[in-house]
Amino acid sequence: MKTALSIAGSDSCGGAGIQADIKTMTMNGVYAMTVITALTAQNTTGVRAIQEATPAFLKEQLDAVFEDIFPDAVKIGMVSSSDLIRVIAERLRHYGAKNIVVDPVMVATSGSSLMKTDAVQTLIDELLPLSTVITPNIPEGEILSSEKIESKDDMERAAKRIGDTYGCAVLLKGGHRVNDANDLLYAGGEMQWFEGKRIDNPNTHGTGCTLSSAIASNLAKGYSLSESVTRAKEYISGALSAMLDLGKGAGPMQHNFDLRGEFAKENTK
């Protein structure tokens, strides 16, 4: 069985972070492992508190995973401080990690900040050069490219600038501010658009986490980057279309929408 590692924060309400990643990786057919960068006290309405892992404990987690079950792909999500980013980058280089997907999480769906200001530059310097692909949304893409993004032409310019500057593929997600759900992949000097239907569902907590971990899962299984993005977008469309409605704010998706079998059946007695 192929394996994938999520390096990310814990979401106490289960819709984003490592909880979303474990569900997504499992539903996409790989064995999920986790390294926790931070504990968050959050729900669908916002983030109440963040407790970071220490750099030393983060290193212990990474070593424990890589020395026993080497991951076929790595997804990196919320990493809130420069010290933690440096530990991750050093350990990934040390072990020769492959198929690295970086979701540069800066702000939660609820609007709460998840990254310290100085950590953004450290992420750019340390993690982007190691990445197979990064998956910024429009606001994150503006920060990484130093360009305003308001159209598809802007997306193409920004993705090219990010990819050429940092030497990684870029999946720039068009769901924020651009009036469709189309995403742009810039890889190997080529542009590829992925069309997506906009689903009228306000419950989008954890969509970025889910997409990036689905891409990592498919890379782990040997699909090309383009195929992995296509399959990941199909999966997230299914999870959104299931119309799960939980919580008082932007609720989670139904990650297990395609779960079948005896143990998934509801009690009808």
How should these model regions be labeled?
Residues G29-M33, Q192, N218-A232:
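Phosphate-handling active-site elements
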Residues I7-C13, M191-H205:
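Short pre-catalytic strand/loop immediately N-terminal to key active-site residues, enriched for Gly-Thr
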Residues T3-S6, T26-T109:
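Conserved N-terminal subdomain of the carbohydrate kinase-like
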Residues T117-M191:
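Conserved phosphate/ATP/ADP-binding segment of small-molecule kinases
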Residues A49-E52, S226-K269:
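Charged C-terminal helix
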Residues G14-V30:
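N-terminal basic/disordered segments at the start of proteins
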Residues Q19, E142-I143, N201-L225:
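Short, small-residue alpha-helix embedded
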